[in-house]
Amino acid sequence: MSLPSRQTAIIVNPPPPEYINTKKNGRLTNQLQYLQKVVLKDLWKHSFSWPFQRPVDAVKLKLPDYYTIIKNPMDLNTIKKRLENKYYVKASECIEDFNTMFSNCYLYNKPGDDIVLMAQALEKLFVQKLSQMPQEEQVVGGKERIKKGTQQNIAVFSAKEKSSPNATEKVFKQQAIPSVFPKTSVSPLNVAQGASVNSSSQSVAQVTKGVKRKADTTTPATSVVKASSEFSPTFTEKSVTLPPIKENMPKNVLPDSQQQYNVVKSVKVTEQLRHCSEILKEMLAKKHFSYAWPFYNPVDVNALGLHNYYDIVKNPMDLGTIKEKMDNQEYKDAYKFAADVRLMFMNCYKYNPPDHEVVTMARMLQDVFETHFSKIPVEPVESMPLCYIKTDITETTGRENTNEASSEGNSSGDSEDERVQRLAKLQEQLKAVHQQLQVLSQVPFRKLNKKKEKSKKEKKKEKVNNSNENPRKMCEQMRLKEKSKRNQPKKRKQQYIGQKSEDEDNAKPMNYDEKRQLSLNINKLPGDKLGRVVHIIQSREPSLSNSNPDEIEIDFETLKASTLRELEKYVSACLRKRPLKPPAKKIMMSKEELHSQKKQELEKRLLDVNNQLNSRKRQTKSEKTQPSKAVGSVSRLSESSSSSSSSSESESSSSDLSSSDSSGSESEMFPKFTEVKPNDSPSKENVKKMKNECILPEGRIGITQIECSVQDKTSANTTLVHQTTPSHVMPPNHHQLAFNYQELEHLQTVKNISPLQILPPSGDSEQLSNGITVMHPSGDNATTMLESECQAPVQKDIKIKNADSWKSLGKSVKPSGVMKSSDELFNQFRKAAIEKEVKARTQELIRKHLEQNTKEPKVSQENQRDLGNGLTVESFSNKIQNKCSGEEQKEHQQSLEAQDKSKLWLLKDRNLAREKEQERRRREAMAGTIDMTLQSDIMTMFENNFD
């Protein structure tokens, strides 16, 4: 025989659970009917119920250890048969069978199994349907069933077997008349222990508690209805623990103690406890079922396998127990109710880890509880609770019933009298404590009021003293007052309660126009200021203190005058602080006006400089007619160099002033051409050194050095400062470059510095289309050729005509900030190419200078020969002018071509910058918009790849 066959032979299924009540004490109640027709029917139709519709077949499923682990098997078919055959006495027994079925599944299977998930789904449906079950259990057709002979046997059986209410009955509160037995824990172990305790021990426990009487709580109806039946003490002792379903008896036939208990229940409870019962109903509502269901029942330690639960949690609590206490009026005030609810949540937090699912559910349910509990109104302390008056009423009525009941009532009454006396003393102590607290709370406010009066007196004294003090002290006191105003909000929080009544009395009521203006001002406030408005209203209006701060409706007719005045102060203060931006605009406008004034002053200075240059030009023309000697020419050269340096200084100073208002963009755009400072003008010592070092050729007048100060594009005023320096002397601090005229013209086409025209030296001034003329006196050039050893720098004058037209042109063409940035980027890009071009030109210059130095002795000999022949200076200068006339025409044509090229370069640069700006704007516009079709295409591609 194989091993599986042996195992199948060993596995034996036990007989199914019984479903016929052999004791024939089963009943049919409204709750049992609901369980049969609604709960069981819905569970049976559920798609996950098929594993639970029949008893577990251990042989077929090959589960040899199932019935060794599960001692009390249960299934839906057995429950269905028991309901059909009236097996159950009350609904709590049927509910216990359902819970047993689910706990067996959780006990045998692992937590992650499919069968466990199916059981959890069924249990959720079961609890949901169970919450809709009628709360009061009533027997259906009970009067026909109950007979005279069997009533006594039912009472004896119930006294022996069911001495305490069932745990599940405590959870769902299905009793019409609350139980009067001593409170037991909800665990099934205590149920078994309670069954072993006899009725006499229960009576002793009830007497010691002294709350309710034992004698005839469950006396059968026949003992009251029939006059012939005898009343025996032994019978009453056995009939103590009859199940608490009493609906089959009329109310006028019930024993006295039960009628007295109904009177006690009808007494009015406090307003706080009513709110607590509403909170409990809210927590048990359907909308909170998804996260409140673990707290409906006590923790089933055996089913969940939590063997160390009671070692960690000493005081278990659940919503079912809290509801039972609330129904039995065990809560004397709302704080005891809140203590039990919070104990339930603390037990959950204590036993479970913080990241557990039950902890998150507990936090959600606790948020619901705390939000509702915070809205309970506060009530004053009463002299005597109603519950103790109720017990006295039950005593006096109970003493008149029987002798035995009166004796037991006396013993319980004595204990109750002692308790009432103790409670009265405790209440007196509480009153004394409350009075002390009120006195202590009023003392600091009195002190604060005294401090206020003192501070007012001190302020008056300070005002009198301040009239005789210096203005500096007055300023210091003003600063101190401002600091005190800043610190006032902290003091207001402390003095608010004491000043509240005074503010309400002194506040002036608002009329309709003021209220309307206040509402308009509140609507003008920004969103961050509205929170303070809500805080002011809630702090001053008790009726709105519990309202939601996110959404609040304000009715100005219901608000107090003090609240409205406080709102008016706050709103006016906020609106005063807001209009700070218009003055800034005024300041900006004033800056622009100053900027324009500076420009006008600089233009006037430029015109003055031009006038001075014209006067000097006339002086130089008059000097041409006088004959000059070699020595005199040298002295005259030194004077002209000094005058040129002074004129260059004046021009450079004017250019510095004109460029001071610019934003410094010239240093970034054109780093090779910077402003000329006064310190850079050639001194006499430098001129002497230059005489000893270099000699220029005959046809060459001088190599000019250009210095451009390019202003900001908003000013659009450009000036050129031409200064003659030796060819090889180039100060590195300002990156000055020396070129001949042809090379400068070619460089201008590359750099596109300005539309100014640089002309070759000539005696006459040629006016260009741009309105700028460059003057080159010929007389000075003739005198310079008399020196054979060296060549001194020659002055060149600049005259700017039509300055107003240039100003209007600069103002009319104002590129935007975006164009400016693009031009800067493009110029930086051109920087490398320009530097290469400059290096090449400097190398060519050096090479040409070397060639010219070899020709210089020949030129000096020719000059001496001409002087020996008796030629005058004027004839010599005429020769030079005739030689240079052809070259000037060529250079003029080249300059015009260079200007055309520069215009083409400018047009190209502008078009390129415009295209870049359009592209940038298009990208910004595309970045701001969302292409929904592209997004949908991306999502479809993602879904296809995901599948």
From Swiss-Prot:
Record carries keyword Transmembrane helix: no
Gene Ontology molecular function terms on file: histone H4 reader activity; lysine-acetylated histone binding
Any GO CC annotation of this UniProt entry: chromatin
Residues covered by region (Disordered): 395-421, 444-512, 610-690, 849-873
Site feature: Histone H4K5ac binding: 109, 114
Recorded coiled-coil stretches: 417-470
Residue stretches making up the NET domain: 500-582
Location relative to the cell: Nucleus
PTM entry text: Ubiquitinated in a SPOP-dependent manner, leading to proteasomal degradation.
Oligomer and partners: Interacts with SMARCE1. Interacts with mRNA splicing machinery proteins SRSF2, DDX5, HNRNPK and TARDBP. Interacts with the acetylated N-terminus of histone H1, H2, H3 and H4. Interacts with P-TEFb components CDK9 and CCNT1/cyclin-T1.
Domain comment (free text): Bromo domains mediate interaction with histones that have acetylated lysine residues at specific positions. Bromo domain 1 mediates binding with histone H4 acetylated at 'Lys-5' and 'Lys-8' (H4K5ac and H4K8ac, respectively). The bromo domains also recognize and bind a subset of butyrylated histones: able to bind histone H4 butyrylated at 'Lys-8' (H4K8ac), while it is not able to bind H4 butyrylated at 'Lys-5' (H4K5ac).
Assigned keywords, A-Z: Activator, Bromodomain, Chromatin regulator, Coiled coil, Differentiation, Meiosis, mRNA processing, mRNA splicing, Nucleus, Phosphoprotein, Repeat, Spermatogenesis, Transcription, Transcription regulation, Ubl conjugation
Family per similarity comment: Belongs to the BET family.
Pfam families, per database record: BET (PF17035), BRD4_CDT (PF17105), Bromodomain (PF00439)
Motif Nuclear localization signal positions after renumbering to this chain: 209-220
Modified residues (Phosphoserine): 187
This protein's name: Bromodomain testis-specific protein
Low complexity: compositionally biased ranges: 403-413, 631-668
Basic and acidic residues: bias regions: 470-481, 674-690, 849-865
Function: Testis-specific chromatin protein that specifically binds histone H4 acetylated at 'Lys-5' and 'Lys-8' (H4K5ac and H4K8ac, respectively) and plays a key role in spermatogenesis. Required in late pachytene spermatocytes: plays a role in meiotic and post-meiotic cells by binding to acetylated histones at the promoter of specific meiotic and post-meiotic genes, facilitating their activation at the appropriate time. In the post-meiotic phase of spermatogenesis, binds to hyperacetylated histones and participates in their general removal from DNA.
InterPro entries from the UniProt entry: BRD4_CDT, Bromo_Brdt_I, Bromo_Brdt_II, Bromo_chromatin_reader, Bromodomain, Bromodomain-like_sf, Bromodomain_CS, NET_dom
Residue ranges occupied by any Bromo domain in the UniProt entry: 27-133, 267-376
GO biological process, one term: regulation of DNA-templated transcription
Compositional bias (Basic residues): 447-462, 482-494
